[in-house]
């Protein structure tokens, strides 16, 4: 096959006047490379032929890679060597002093026609690979010497270590030429005393260093680029020239296996490696464990004497220690990672996390826990970072366990007495000292008071929860205790006092871009809504940076005028709705929160327990108060003849629209209440009434006096919410402040006067009872209440509709008595 190829090449290569290209082609063909790339490489390298005459080395490397199967091909070509001089490639006599390689010509008996008697060259001295571009060796050398040398297992050991082998020149023809290369290579190295097969050893980055001239000029690369294609399995990342360290062991290792990294005891070639160590970062150690630790497998390395004290670093091990400050314990912790497990050792008492230590040994959980439980002296840590949790045992016991499980070398330098000296590496000595000093200082000072440390942890959690809302324009949500209803907000005010709310001092941070960005996002016009009560009662210590503004926050009162969040479109737009609320500046800040903030339903305060079925109990509020609530919707004292009219006036229309969606059966009654509630503290109203875009209170919110509302709540949903509202408002409105009844809350829907509604009637009855309970409820009032009918609407009772809810009395008097 080769011969036919050569014949084909004759015409093509005639211009080349050398069998060099032919031999290349054959080699390339053997290497399963395309002819064109090889020729290109040979041509490409030609210009350098005259430039330098150091090309012989590459031929040697390729020789090694060649497999015995290639011998027949090369031998015939060896005869053609004489042509090479025409190529101006001097015979092997060319070794240049600069190469630093002394070549000894070894007559090669296998080649009879070799003009180059020095088929083999021994590299007497390890020399750093020359970076100068090397022209390809003469074809005679290439074909003849390579073939003989690579195939000759008896080749002197020198071949195994050609320091400046440029595979790049002929990667495809020779180095990659045969898959068998490793086998001949092993033969070549067989004289080496290492028993291990070289292929595995080649895996080490160091092994490849000699052959891989990552420092080589790009000249080699063109040829090398072809090589990878030929043998993808080698997976040369960048071709032969790529840095040795980067190559997976398999890449070059298959071709030039272990020669580079002698076994620990076999250092024949180590001098070469050392020479290259600077360039290739090959460790001077005979063995360079890939992991950087002497023993990543748990089995002692060859030539490594197990050290039970943990003071001696295993071969090739690099101390990897990190230190962190364990705030909870006030101690510095040294951490060493082994097998993906972080084992920590305290600096103060040198106790070691036995749980993690035994995890490194791969011990089962049951056995591990049993061993640790039997320890007399132990410290159990159940909170904190995962790598610090577990059972801490004394240093001596930990060392015993490590020795018993044979993981002491894996854990190096965990047991080194002066582990602090290894911390971070001398380059960072200053930082190391700083860390150690800080830990010592803290230990001397004693652990910081809990509050100082915890604020960042416990305190921040809640704060962060608020933050989403804080960052939103709704400043009211930000801090108000009432906000509890909101999903992330803190609990109700009653609990807020004990909650880790931000310290009052934090208020100074308001406008600063504190970590929470309190001030920046809250409109200043609307002071942060954090209740002053909260700020005053902060349970947490003052932690300026992280805590939300506290006392500085202007009281919610400022909000009252503004309809909770002016920023909220529906709030600002709804001021009228809010008007019901806002007008009651009397509302406590919390009260405001109930309006401005759409309190989440969850927010309901315990106080907000559903309105008592017996509305009368809390109802004792004066009718005036009721009037205020109602008056909000329509001006106080202003009677609304029609439900619809009231709604329209109140901007309730929006409310009504929301009402439609409102399914609160109790809401109908509640809505009227909402007006009242403006006075109520949000805790009272903490219902999510805000859910209505209008900002109306939800039934509970509205249910300021739970009793009245309770009737509404308890009663089954009224078929017509409006009726409920009417009934409620009627009840409300009729009380002494009937005029204030502007309880416009009555739904805009035409009052359905389901006098027949049992549920409505029941609700109305409750309402009546509530009214009776009212201090103001006089006999006349009650009678008027019962007498209320649709006609009452003219009186301007809240929407007049409410009376409809009232069951018609047999004596039903059409006119309402005011």
Swiss-Prot record:
Residues 640-649, 766-777 have a biased composition (Basic and acidic residues). Disulfide bonds: none annotated. SMART domains: KilA-N (SM01252). Disruption phenotype: Blocks conidiation and causes aberrant hyphal morphology. Decreases expression of developmental regulators brlA and abaA. Residues 320-426 form the HTH APSES-type domain. SUPFAM superfamilies: DNA-binding domain of Mlu1-box binding protein MBP1. Gene3D superfamilies: Transcription regulator HTH, APSES-type DNA-binding domain. PROSITE patterns: HTH_APSES. This is Cell pattern formation-associated protein stuA. The lineage of its organism: Eukaryota, Fungi, Dikarya, Ascomycota, Pezizomycotina.
